Structures are given as structure tokens and as C-alpha cells.
Swiss-Prot record:
It comes from the Archaea. It comes from Ignicoccus hospitalis (strain KIN4/I / DSM 18386 / JCM 14125). Belongs to the UPF0179 family. This is UPF0179 protein Igni_1272. PANTHER family: UPF0179 PROTEIN MJ1627.
Length: 165
């Protein structure tokens, strides 16, 4: 989805960045509300610059209004699921190695059983545990929530008794 939002003046069409959200420095800025439209953690691609007026920014120096497109969220999947264009069921890793440089992308906080469309396969990841993993850009499509009511009705996805097969 394309949006017109503030981008640093030096960004050019095709540049990508990860939105980190607004900072305490942003208090009182006239563009703060526009910057809050960025989804924290998402990758955006600059499609073009729309505005000619440069605005002062305490974080980036100068910004202009630019057309940006949501690309997706960086995450790490098992290699067997990393197929460009595929929609897969994503469950975050239970890894507890918070010192691993890939930990954040392996344990994305979306919850369990999220349908994710793999937009782009980026690279293989060297997992300290030796697991075959790949970094991708994904877009959440649907979240399936198991409720007690669905399990009792047999719609929990685990057979008639609501148990794992």
C-alpha cells in the first residue's frame, strides 16, 4: 500500500528502510502525526518524492514528503518454508538465545499460527544452533485464533476431540 509520508531528504527512489517509530525528540513536531503512520518494524521502499518543501527534523535533519510503499516485515523462517510468493503458517521460534544477532527476526511477536505471505527471500542465516534458516520479507495475511468454543465444535483444527493428531 502506497502512502505519502515524511522521508529523509537524502533518500532516493528505490531506497529501503525499517520504520522505528517516533522518539521523544519528536514531541512538538508538526509532522509527528504523519510519522506515526509508519508501522514500527516494517520495511518501506521510497517510490518517489512528492513535496519540494524541506522540513526540519530533529532526528533526520531535513525531510520531504515522499511516496513510500509497505514492503513487509523482516523475519526468519525454516528453509523449507522460504518460498517466494508462498503463504505459510508462521509460528515464532522458541529460541532463548537473546544474544544471537538473529533472535529478534526469529521470534517476531505476532503470536502463534499467523498466515504470512513470503514477498522476498533475502539470504540464508547462520544459526548458532545449526538450524537451516532463511531471512525473508513477509506480510501477515491472517491470524487464526483457537478458542474453546471452536475446539468444542470441532473447528479447532485438531480432529473431533480437539486434540493433536
Amino acid at each position: 500500500m502506497k502512502k505519502v509520508l515524511p522521508v529523509p531528504k537524502e533518500f532516493k527512489p528505490g531506497d529501503r528502510f525499517v520504520a522505528v517509530g517516533t522518539l521523544p525528540l519528536c514531541e512538538g513536531c508538526m509532522l509527528k502525526e504523519r510519522c506515526e503512520e509508519y508501522k514500527r518494524g516494517w520495511i518501506y521502499e521510497v517510490k518517489g518524492k512528492v513535496g519540494l518543501v524541506e522540513h526540519d527534523c530533529k532526528v533526520h535533519g531535513k525531510v520531504v514528503m515522499g511516496e513510500v510503499e509497505e514492503v513487509g516485515i523482516p523475519l526468519i523462517l525454516p528453509k523449507r518454508l522460504a518460498i517466494e510468493g508462498a503463504t505459510v503458517e508462521y509460528t515464532p521460534s522458541k529460541c532463548t538465545n537473546k544474544k544471537c544477532p538473529h533472535w529478534r527476526d526469529c521470534t517476531a511477536p505476532w503470536g502463534e499460527r499467523v498466515k504470512v505471505k513470503v514477498r522476498e527471500v533475502l539470504e540464508e542465516v547462520q544459526c548458532p544452533l545449526g538450524l537451516p534458516l532463511v531471512r525473508v520479507i513477509g506480510v501477515p495475511v491472517e491470524v487464526k485464533r483457537r478458542t474453546r468454543r471452536n475446539i468444542k465444535k470441532g473447528k479447532g483444527g485438531h480432529g473431533k476431540r480437539g486434540l493433536a493428531p
